[in-house]
Structures are given as C-alpha cells and as structure tokens.
Regions:
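Short gly/pro/ser/thr-enriched loop/turn and capping motifs at secondary-structure boundaries
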Residues: 92-99, 118-119
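Extracytoplasmic/secreted cell-surface and envelope-processing proteins
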Residues: 71-72, 96
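Short glycine-rich anion-binding loops that position phosphate/pyrophosphate groups of nucleotides
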Residues: 66-68, 92-94, 158
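Iron-sulfur (Fe-S) cluster-binding modules
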Residues: 1-62, 72-73, 77-85, 104, ...
Length: 313
C-alpha cells in the first residue's frame, strides 16, 4: 500500500509548493509511489475532507508557511491529529520566516497600515458572517510553536537536494530519529566555493554598492553573509551566484541564536587599523554601517529573537 502524503500551506508565498518541481523528473517517480491524501494547492481538497479522515490516516504531512491566522492554527492542529508525521517544510514553518518580521509591530499597527483607520474586523459590508476573513493572531509563529513537529526540511524554499534526502528516507522507511533537520550540521561556509583569506572586516557594504570579486569571500569584501552561522545543504547557492547567504536553512546547532552568533563573529572580525582604545570609535563606525540589523540577522527567525516585541493584540 502506498504511503499517504499531505501538503498544506499556511502563511506562505507559495514558493514551497513550487519547490517540488526543482527536483525535476524525479518528482514524477516520487508521486508515483505515494497517495496524495490532501494537497489544496494541487488538487481540490476541502477542510471537510480532512475532518472525515480517521486519526493517523495520513503517513506524513508537509506543512509550509508561518502560523499567522486562527484558521492556520486550526488546520495544522487538524493535520497533526490526522497524521503520523508532521514535517516543517521551508523556512517559514521552520523558523517563522519573512512573515514573522511583522512580529516587530503590534497587530493593530499592521492592520491600520494595511487598511487604514476605517478598517473593522468582520465580513465586508452586506456580506454574511462566514465571509469574514480569518482572525489575525497576535504573532506569526513557526510550526513547532503550534503543534509538535517530527522533522524539518529547511530553506526558502527547500533546495532540491534536501527534498530528495527527505523523500529517499521517507519512501525507504528509514527515517532518522524524530527531531532531525534535513540539512548539514556544519556551516554553509564549509561548502562555499569562494576563497577566504583575510578573515578580517575592514568595512561593511551593501550588495548593490560594489561589484564583488567572483572568487573571494563576500565577508572579506565587507558584504554581510550569514554563511558562518547557517546550516549547509544548498551548495552555497546564493554566494555562488554573487549574493550573500541570508540564513534560510536556519542556524547550525553550534550557532544556536543566529543573530547573536553573527554579531559575535562580526565583532571579532572587524579591524579599523588601530590598536587599543583608539580603535573603538572606528570599529563602531564600521559596525554602524550594518543597515537593518534585525532584518539582516533575523530575516527568517524573529520568533527566536530574544528582544522581539510581545506583540499582544
């Protein structure tokens, strides 16, 4: 009997659903070996269909997106009940992702910015109550803060190699212990083709401000690259293409808190050409060139940021 698979999106952009195509022709072989039990982005699947399934009917549910609305929360709880395994698929489900940057603002601030002062909760004028949009939760949550998660396939979106690793393990019945993250333990720098020589930071520049040397380490050139604190597993796709790593595969086990670890790394690398106390003002000047520290260092992981707002709303 074929294993039953579910794929569901919550607060996401849709890129994770499209990412299955990155596997190429191999996805045809994967789909031939599973039964799609529930996948609204691919087939006409309703909540009622899911509710009618017995507990544990689905062998694995891959959920992408942050938990942003009450409906998201209800659906993932329902999927947890109906599934033997829950997989956090992609950076938003894993860490909170881009949607979690909204946690820096209170819910009322977000709604006012989007809809203006006249916005009120509920259905549009003249529409029935069932047409009301789902209630916005006070904060965007990673999947593990909503339901127990068994496995994680990280990335924005997950790279083809990691998708393949997951399905190889799943279809063979040789899954690793629960809690496993389908990515490397070592940092992305370990698989980056760029050459690191100076290991010092003499300046900070934004990617559009220079034409980077195609062979040299981006950090050595002053571009903030999160490769030192990010899990490997994507073959350093962004640095290989001339763009810095933004941390979408999540922190290495050693790094823990990605932002704090990267700040520590930058502080140890910065060199102003001075010694002792005379260097402090110039080193501060270099570090102050870091534009949008939160968006840079916690682009995908605001829920784990120690100083994030509570955002009650």
């Amino acid at each position: 009997m074929k294993p039953k698979l579910a794929v569901y999106w919550t607060g996401s952009c849709g890129g994770c659903d499209v990412s299955f195509l990155e596997v190429g022709e191999a996805i045809v072989e994967v789909l031939s070996q599973v039964e799609i039990a529930f996948w609204p982005a691919l087939a006409d699947s309703k909540k009622a269909d899911l509710e009618a399934m017995p507990k544990g009917y689905i062998d694995a549910a891959l959920i992408n997106g942050a938990i942003r609305t009450q409906e998201n929360l209800e659906m993932v709880r329902l999927l947890r009940e109906k599934s033997k395994l829950i997989v956090a698929y992609g950076a938003c489900a894993h860490l909170g992702g881009i949607p979690s940057l909204a946690n820096l603002y209170r819910r009322e601030e977000l709604l006012k910015a989007a809809f203006g002062d006249g916005w009120r909760p509920g259905p549009p004028p003249g529409a029935p109550q069932e047409d009301a949009p789902p209630e916005l939760l006070p904060k965007a949550l990673p999947l593990a803060q909503a339901v127990p998660v068994d496995y994680t396939v990280p990335g924005c979106p997950p790279p083809a190699g990691l998708i393949g690793e997951f399905f190889s393990a799943f279809l063979s019945g040789e899954m690793p212990p629960p809690g496993h993250v389908f990515a490397k333990v070592k940092a992305l720098c370990e698989e980056c083709p760029r050459t690191r020589e100076e290991r010092v930071l003499k300046k900070i520049v934004r990617p559009h401000e220079i034409v980077p040397d195609p062979e040299a380490c981006l950090l050595d050139q002053g571009i903030i690259c999160l490769g030192p604190v990010t899990r490997g597993g994507c073959s350093a796709a962004c640095p290989s293409a001339g763009m810095p790593c933004t941390g979408c595969l999540g922190p290495t086990p050693k790094a823990g808190d990605m932002g704090l670890s990267m700040i520590s790394a930058l502080a140890s690398l910065v060199r102003a050409g001075e010694e002792g106390e005379a260097a402090i003002p110039k080193e501060d000047e270099i570090l102050n060139r870091l534009v949008d520290p939160i968006g840079t260092l916690y682009k995908y992981g605001v829920p784990d940021m120690p100083c994030a707002k509570e955002g009650e709303g």
